[in-house]
Amino acid sequence: MPSRPRPSFVSHLLPGSLALCGLALACAVQGEERRSLEPMVVTGSYNPSDTFDLPFSVDSIERRQIADGQLGINLSEVLPRVPGLVVQNRQNYAQDLQISSRGYGARSAFGIRGLKLLADGIPASTPDGQGQAATLNLDVAERIEVLRGPASTIYGSNAGGVIQMFSRDGQGAPRVGAETTVGSDGLSRNHLYTEGEGDGVGFLVDASRMDTDGYRDHSAARRDQTFAKLNFRPDADSRLALIYSSLEQNDTEDPLGQTWDAYKHDPRSVTANAELYDTRKSIDHQQAGMNYERYFGEATLQVNAYVGKRSVVQYLSIPRGVASNSQRGGGVVDFDRDFPGGTVRWLQPVSQAPGELNLTVGLDYDQSRDDRRGYQNFNGDQLGVKGELRRDEVDTATSLDPYLQASWAIDAWTLQAGVRHSTMKMEVDDRYLSNGDASGSRRYRKNTPSFSVMYAFTPDLHGYLSAGKGFETPTQAEMAYAPVAANAPDVFNFGLKPATSSQYEAGLKARLWGNTRVNAAIFQIRTEDEIVVASSLGGRTSYQNAGKTLRRGFELGLESELSEHWNANLAYTRLSATYDSDFEAGGKTIGKGKHLPGVPESSLFGELVWKPAEGISMGWEGMYRSQVYVEDSNSEKAAPSYAVFNWRTRFEQRLGAWAFHQLVRLDNLFDRQYVGSVIVGDGNRRYYEAAPGLSWYAGAGVEYQF
């Protein structure tokens, strides 16, 4: 069969280019009078800046959007409104969400990879790039900033994009509150909090518990989260915040993936091995940190420091015969992780320069140390329990990154340039020596520069160009297992190389009719040594380097206050992500032009919000996603495209010192059966994870102000 010609660069980006030209024409006829809808952000620039004036793609999701009719459980509730992001809710709290930005992170079998997660400036990702979205607590979020494109490379390794949450400070009169939510599949969530300010000290204490039976069989979960924050001024020239957070999930059931036939027969079903081995995961995550800021005239010193501990025990469905092999690492993963780190940053305005010139110099230090053990997942005839020791090692990842950034606004021009020197060292101290000593280390070094320039054609139309070079080291989890023969011992994959990338972006930012904001961008990313799945069996995944990949795309974001009572939001992404050279994987040749698995070609999110009166809001949400390939050869059944629609409403009342609110939410209004996420490259062909049908949720809350 003759191969289908690959779409040209022009065919991929022509629609985006036409959209950019249309924006330019629309803005050229706008008057000078306008009302800015742009929020202030610090991600990408370190200095608080209007998103409209920054020469790269950055968005902010505000507190009202995070809280309006949402459940406050998962980032998948709010992140789809950002173009370029794909958020897949696995309906599996043992494996967390899958989030990708312009294709970065799509390969992740669990957790977040390829993206930098931050909370109040403190990393929520380990130095090697592994993160968990659940550690970001939506109950306390003031805003979430999302940076995409070349400018994200200033954040170093594994920063294909940056997602940064900022918690709110305790302010105003002290108050206490409680809310409860119930819903489909046995969902219940209870939330308590107190916050306010007294004697110059702001405080916020928050605790919640979520229970669910899960949509699929064997997917029950309980999640407990706590958060505490104190913020105050030690003196007139400084600010200090002390922050503590925790996440606990005990015996969270893991339903694993589904084959296509099993999914079609019963979307709620699980493979027999999930119940036979009682696949599950327990997480205990605790973290404490501080943010200190001191002003020296016009200059600012910022210091962040944190310490944390994370313990995980995970029971896999590794068959008994494999788990008992003395050359293998068993079927139970058990590790205790300590992760300290900190940042020192100096922000210096240069008043002698023409225009507005700001310099930033900083140093980031991060470390994670895993005391990792592996056990058989059986004891005698009893399956799904911890048996004999099969792996014992200490894995350490350490990064030390100095960086420099300059931003210069002069007349109609804004220029920003930065460079970061990233050093990452991974070490393994093998203490299980009966099958050989697998100790070793690997060091990665790379300079990641970025440059952006913006020109203000009019006060309401800004155009920009951005370029950068990045790199993505493998995570310790990706290096944990080398692709080896069946009778060879499990060894660390020190041969895995980092992926390197060159990114380019061009965009327009426009304000139309005084009430509408539009951001549009076209981009291209070329990557070498892309890290891809080599094999995935029974919950154990090994990785390898492929050749080259090519990603070209277009993003469009729109936010409009249509009238006093109506708001609209739109986020559209068109992305072609393909392999740009042949490579060998799993005994097969993956040909140039094959699509990267886990990356939809088209994504669309739309929202219409009606607020007929104070304290009443109603929203309609729609989301479309094109088909998603599940493995590199693109020969297995792709997860089909789908469109789903949701509806929500929220009511608020005030009575003296009391405030009340209620919410009702319906997801998947038309009860569509669809695959919500995929497990890339699963060796058992269990690629698919079903999403729920029609689901309902209802909640109520009360707050008292002293």
Label the model's feature ranges.
Residues 191, 291-296, 300-318, 456, ...:
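Membrane-embedded beta-barrel scaffold of Gram-negative outer-membrane proteins
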Residues 239-245, 282-433, 516-522, 561, ...:
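Face-selective signature of the C-terminal outer-membrane beta-barrel domain
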Residues 345-353, 359, 409, 415, ...:
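Gram-negative outer-membrane beta-barrel transporters
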